[in-house]
Amino acid sequence: MSSQVLASSQKNDKTQNIIRPTTKFHPPIWGDRFLHYNISEQELEYKEGQVEELKEVVRKEIFHGNNKRNIINVSKQLKLIDDVERLGLSYHFESEIEKKLQHIYEITTNNIDHQDQHYYYSNHDEDLHDVSIRFRLLRQHGFNISSNIFEKFKDESGKFKESLKSDIEGMLSLYEASYLSYVEENILDEALAFTTTNLKLVANKKEHPLSHEISLALYRPLRKTLVRLYARHYISIYEKQPSHNKVLLQFAKLDFNLLQSLHKKELSEISRWWKELDLANKLPFARNRIVELYLWILGVFHEPQFSLARKILIKAISMASVADDIYDAYGTFEELELLTEAILRWDISFIDKLSPDYLKTYYKVFLNSYEECEKDLKKEERYKLHYAKESMKKLIQAYFHEAQWLNQGHFPSFDEHLKVSFVSSGYPMLIETSFVGMQDVKTNQVFEWLSTQPKIFRACTIISRFMDDLVSRKFEQERNHVPSTVDCYMKQYGVSEQEACDELNKQVVNLWKEINQEFLRPTSMPSSILVRILNFTKVLDIIYKEGDGYTHVGKLVKDSVAALLIDPIPL
C-alpha cells in the first residue's frame, strides 16, 4: 500500500525529483451521490408541521397526562422515558424529562415505599429490570445514585444469584447499566462480566425474541452508541413490542425522516463546497472523505438547531484532514517547516514564500475556509473563532513536532509521545471548534474551561489517540512513520505488542468511567456542553471499532452512512 516514489506535487512545481513518502488512499466510495438533494421548502415545512403536531400530542400524553385520578407507576414512567430516549426524541423534551427524573430521584432515594397524588413507588416491587433502568437513567442524567442498589441481587457468597440467568430482560438491562460505572466500582465490573457471559448464550439462540436486541447490545452498548444510529435500530424493535405507543412510534418515524432530510440537504451543500475546492485534483495525495467527515460530525450534534456548528466544524475537520496527510504522508521536512510558519502567521501575504505550489493551493483554501466561517457567525459571536484558530495552530505545531521526531530518527518515551500525540489526535481542536458555532454558547467561559484540560476533555482525547493507534499502527508502519503510542509503550515498559495493546485497551475502559463520573452533579459545565464531548467519544466506536474506518472505509462506516443519510424509515 505504501511506497517511496519519485514525485512532484504539481506539474508546475519548481522542485523536481523529490523523494516523497506517499501512501495510496482509496478514492471516495460515494462519488457524486450526495452532491444534489432536491427538496422544496414547502415539503420541508410540511414535514416539520407533521412533527410539531405529533410532538404536542406526545407531550400531553406522556409528560403532562398525570392528574389526581391517574397515579403513575414509577417503573412504567421510567420505561416511557427510556423509550423516548432510545427513539432519539429526548431533544424535544429535555425540560420534561429533567422534571420527571428529578421527582423520581427524590421519591426513590430514601429506598422506601411512596405514593402521592401522581406517583406510586414500591422498593419491594422492583425487579432487576426495573432497578437497572432506574439506575441507568438517573446516573446518565447526573443524579447521585449508588451502585449498591444491586447488592440485593447477590447471594451469600457475594456473587450474582444464579436465578437471574433466567431473567433475560433483567440481565440485558443490568448489562446496559454496567456501562455507566465509575472508576473502581467493582460491583458494576462484576455485573458486566456476569451479564456478558450469559447474554452471549442467549444471543446464539436465534429463536429467542430478544436475541437480535442482545446481539446489538453486545456489539455496542447503549452508552457507546450514537443517538441517531440507535434510534434507527430501536424504532423497528419498539414497533414489535405489543404494548408500544402508536403515537410515539409514528412521531419517532416522522422525526427521524425529517432530520434525515435536513441532514441530506446540508450534506449536499457541503459536498458542493468541497467539489468546488477541487482538492481531489489539486492535492490528489490526500484522503477524500467529506461524507465520512460529515458522519463524524453528525454523531456529535444531529439536532436541527446546530446546523451552523456542523457547517463550521466540517470546514475545520476537512482542513485538518488534508494537513494530516501533508505532514504524515507527503510533504518533505523543509516544506513542512514553511507550512507550519505560514499557519502560525495566519497571513495571506506569506503565500509567496510557500513552495512547491501545492502548499500555496492548500494555504489559500485553508485561510478562505476560516474566513467563510467568520462570515457565517454573527458579528457579536466572531470572537469565538479566535479559539478555533488557536487550537488549529496547536494542532499544526503537533503535526510538525512529530515530523521533527521522524526527521531526527527520535524514538520518544510513551509519556513524551502522549504530550504531543494528545494534540495531534485532532480532538482538542475539534472539541474546541465544535462550540464556536453553537449559538447557546454565549461567552468565552466554555473556552476558558477547555484551556484547563478538564478530565472529560482529557479522557475523550486520550481515548481517540489510543483507539486510532491501536487500529492504524500496522498500516502506518508500511512507510517511514513516527512511532505510535503502542510502540512507545512497548519500549518504555519492555512489554510485548499484545501486552501493550491490552494495557491501552484497559486504559480506554477506565477513561470511559472517568467520562461517566464527570456527569455527576454538580457538574463543571452544563450537561449540554458535556454531552458534546461524550458524543465525540461515541463516534470513535464507529470510526475505529473495526479498523481505521476513516482511512479504509469499511462496511461499518458504509452502513452507518446508509442508515443516517440514504435510507428513510418506511412509514
Swiss-Prot record:
Highly expressed in glandular trichomes. It holds the Pfam family Terpene_synth. It is an enzyme of class 4 (lyase). GO terms for molecular function: magnesium ion binding; terpene synthase activity. Mg(2+) 2 binds at D324, D328. Mg(2+) 3 binds at D468, S472, E476. Pathway: Secondary metabolite biosynthesis; terpenoid biosynthesis. Its cofactor is Mg(2+); Mn(2+). It catalyses: (2E,6E)-farnesyl diphosphate = (1E,4E)-germacrene B + diphosphate. Its EC number is 4.2.3.71. A motif (DDXXD motif) lies at residues 324-328. (2E,6E)-farnesyl diphosphate binds at R287, D324, D328, R465, D468. Binds 3 Mg(2+) or Mn(2+) ions per subunit. GO terms for biological process: diterpenoid biosynthetic process. Mg(2+) 1 binds at D324, D328. Keywords: Lyase, Magnesium, Metal-binding. Belongs to the terpene synthase family. Tpsb subfamily. Involved in sesquiterpene olefins biosynthesis, constituants of cannabinoids and terpenoids-rich resins. Catalyzes mainly the conversion of (2E)-farnesyl diphosphate to germacrene B, which is spontaneously converted to gamma-elemene as a thermal degradation product. The Asp-Asp-Xaa-Xaa-Asp/Glu (DDXXD/E) motif is important for the catalytic activity, presumably through binding to Mg(2+). This is Germacrene B synthase TPS16CC. The lineage of its organism: Eukaryota, Viridiplantae, Streptophyta, Embryophyta, Tracheophyta.
